[in-house]
Regions:
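Class I SAM-dependent methyltransferase Rossmann-like catalytic core
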Residues: 1-18
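Short alpha-helical segments and helix-capping/turn motifs at coil-helix boundaries
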Residues: 6-11, 24-28, 105-107
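Class I SAM-dependent methyltransferase SAM/SAH-binding core
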Residues: 16-82
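A short His-aromatic
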Residues: 95-99
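Hydrophobic beta-strand segment of the Class I
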Residues: 91-92
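S-adenosyl-L-methionine-dependent methyltransferase catalytic module, highlighting the catalytic core
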Residues: 61-82, 105, 109-111, 115, ...
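Short conserved AdoMet
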Residues: 17, 101, 115
């Protein structure tokens, strides 16, 4: 890893009880928690064969070591059932939550596996400095609605929103300068392609990996403060952190601290 990558990992871990056991979700080729130093379980929603296949096709993974995961968190299956119900003390998810179709339900399952006082470290892309620039931030109503609907795959609406409103960020965009109108932006997909993919995922029950939710530091705090105040999520928010050592301009970090021992999903963490 580069010095910046090491600094980034050290900052995220500095707020976590890494002397105890934890979990990192979807580390891919950029794990935050070094399992040669810490007692951490690596988990992904796909198995090791699929992870290695994806890495082989990803130019960004060239020359990178892709660690094996210890367990598969199968979509629609509670996390505790996938890893065993051994209590954990922290969880890390870097650039993962935005891909999850039911973010509140997903976070509840993670909290169910943590001891009271346990921490979840979440690194997210900032809409204001990413391919999601032209999209609307995810709302409180959407987060709660998805937790009621419980989609196990990105929905046609989520697919449609991502494909039809994101743009191709090739790393040269100056987000500090005035941005062009969306109609002038370079896109990965046309509106017609977005419609076709949305119809396809419904017709074929296909899992298409997209950014299901869109966040800024302020919007995340606003939405999850309301979720917590509404009694839907027993946690305390710590952060957000931007511009921390080794971070990129297009990301931010927030921690959620579990404040209750009650099960959130109906699956007791100790059973």
């Amino acid at each position: 890893m580069t010095e910046a990558e090491v600094a980034r990992c050290e900052f995220v871990c500095s707020h976590l009880p890494t002397e105890q056991r934890g979990i990192e979700i979807a580390p891919y080729f950029h794990p935050i928690v070094d399992r040669s130093r810490f007692d951490v379980i690596y988990v992904d929603c796909i198995d090791n064969d699929e992870i290695q296949r994806k890495a082989a096709e990803n130019p960004g993974a060239a020359g990178k070591t892709v660690p094996l995961v210890d367990a598969v968190w199968t979509p629609g299956v509670p996390l505790g059932d996938c890893i065993g119900h051994e209590p954990l003390h922290y969880a890390v998810a870097s650039h993962v939550l935005e891909h999850v179709p039911n973010p509140l339900g997903w976070l509840k399952e993670i909290l169910d596996c943590l001891e009271p006082g346990g921490l979840v470290a979440i690194v997210l892309p900032n809409r204001e400095r990413s391919m999601d620039y032209y999209r609307q931030p995810t709302s409180f109503a959407q987060v709660v609605g998805w937790s009621i609907e419980k989609p196990a795959r990105p929905t046609p609406t989520q697919v449609m929103d991502f494909l039809s409103q994101s743009f191709e960020d090739d790393g040269t965009v100056d987000f500090d300068a005035p941005m062009a109108a969306f109609a002038e932006a370079k896109r990965h997909y046309t509106d017609l392609q977005a419609i076709e993919f949305a119809e396809f995922v419904l017709r074929e029950s296909h899992y298409l990996d997209v950014h299901c939710s869109v966040w800024t530091p302020d919007s995340f705090i606003d939405v999850f403060s309301r979720v917590i105040t509404g009694g839907l999520f027993p946690a305390k928010i710590i952060g957000p952190f931007t511009g921390f050592p080794g971070s990129t301009p297009g990301e931010f970090l927030v921690y959620l601290e579990k404040t209750s021992s009650a099960s959130l999903t109906g699956s007791p963490a100790g059973s």
